A protein has these predicted regions:
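Active-site phosphate/pyrophosphate- and oxyanion-stabilizing loops and adjacent acidic/basic residues
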Residues: 81, 199, 203
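Conserved beta-loop-alpha segment that forms the PLP phosphate-binding cup at the N-terminus of a helix
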Residues: 92-118, 122, 127-137
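PLP-dependent aminotransferase-class I/II
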Residues: 128-200
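A short helix->loop->beta-strand "cap" motif at the edges of active sites that frequently abuts
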Residues: 205-212
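Conserved N-terminal alpha-helix of the aminotransferase class I/II PLP-enzyme fold
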Residues: 52-101, 110
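N-terminal "arm"/small-domain region of PLP-dependent enzymes with the aminotransferase-like
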Residues: 1-74
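Short beta-strands and strand-loop turn motifs
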Residues: 62-64, 179-185, 213
């Protein structure tokens, strides 16, 4: 008996009917190419991380404990250099003190925006948790962007979920410093934005205001 038939018989002995086995095996066969693509992406990313670790000379010394003050903290500096290389960024901030996505976005927005600047969202409302950070609630917590003189402008998507390019163009002003694009739909009924659609939106905005972040 070949391996395939032996496997099928083993499932039958376990109470799985031949019809169920054939159905599941057929799905697995049809998904084989897709799983192979996923494995290739995983392998590519693994090589990318390994090369970044080699470039930044990750060693056992990077895992030594530090005083807690950050003096000569080789491990932390090396980890951030690895992240920057992997994501092709100028630099990276990788700290356990950043506890969630809203926390990370708050740090980024606060670092890049200054009084008089404007933040633009061309895809409608951001996450509820960001409203307090931006300052769009009726009662905002201390330290919101609004409190520091940073304005906010928003352009909603069209009813069919597409970008309102005309209104986005009109919303880009001289003091528009940063554009935030939320890919996830969050709690809104709109579809999640694909990478391709986000790229299209970024290209459009950059063609109008190249210096915007």
């Amino acid at each position: 008996m070949d391996t395939m038939n032996l496997l099928k018989k083993s499932y039958m002995d376990a109470g799985i009917s031949p019809e169920v086995y054939d159905y599941c095996h057929g799905i697995s066969s049809r998904m084989k190419d897709r799983f192979a693509q996923i494995d290739q992406v995983a392998e590519l990313n693994q090589i990318k991380v390994l090369r970044a670790m080699q470039k930044n000379r990750v060693s056992a010394a990077c895992f030594e404990s530090s005083t807690g003050y950050g003096y000569d903290d080789l491990g932390r500096e090396t980890l951030e250099a690895v992240y920057a290389d992997v994501f092709r960024a100028e630099s990276a901030l990788v700290r356990p003190q950043l506890t969630c996505g809203t926390h990370a976005l708050t740090v980024a927005l606060s670092a890049m925006l200054r009084p008089g600047d404007e933040l633009l969202s061309p895809v409608g409302r951001p996450y509820d948790t960001l409203e307090g950070v931006i300052g769009t609630r009726e009662v905002n917590p201390p330290g919101s962007l609004k409190e520091f003189g940073i304005s906010y402008r928003q352009v909603d998507l069209l009813p069919d979920g597409s970008f309102d390019f005309e209104r986005i163009k009109a919303a880009l002003r001289d003091n528009t410093k940063l554009v935030t694009i939320q890919r996830s739909k969050g709690y809104d009924p709109r579809p999640t934005l694909s990478v391709e659609r986000i790229g299209e939106l970024i290209a459009f905005i950059k063609s109008i205001k190249p210096d915007v972040i």
